Amino acid sequence: MAVYKKGFSLAMDIYRESKKFPKDELYSLTSQIRRSSRSVCSNIGEGYRKRQYEAHFVSKMSDSDMENTETQVWLDFALSCEYITKEIFDDFNERSEEIGRLLNHMIQNPEKYK
């Protein structure tokens, strides 16, 4: 599924980039951005597995969208703290926006994914 692949790719790129964050961020920004970006994929996987149950599917895609939005907030912090460059931020944010659009399509059209 395209949205899962895009989410997984972004989560891995965020992980690799976050390895460069200061050590004092390990239990705050670093762990939060890793957790939220990975959670996008885990919620997609859980929801897709139970896609025959429309309410469950929509709920999990909505959870995934919320985690995606949280990831964008952490990216804002990473940019403001100068842990990532504007170029990296723009790339990650653009990819996250695309994931959000795909998730919203799935939320609005769950019958297409049964």
Give residue spans per PLM region.
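Short, C-terminally biased terminal segments at protein or domain edges
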Residues: 1-114
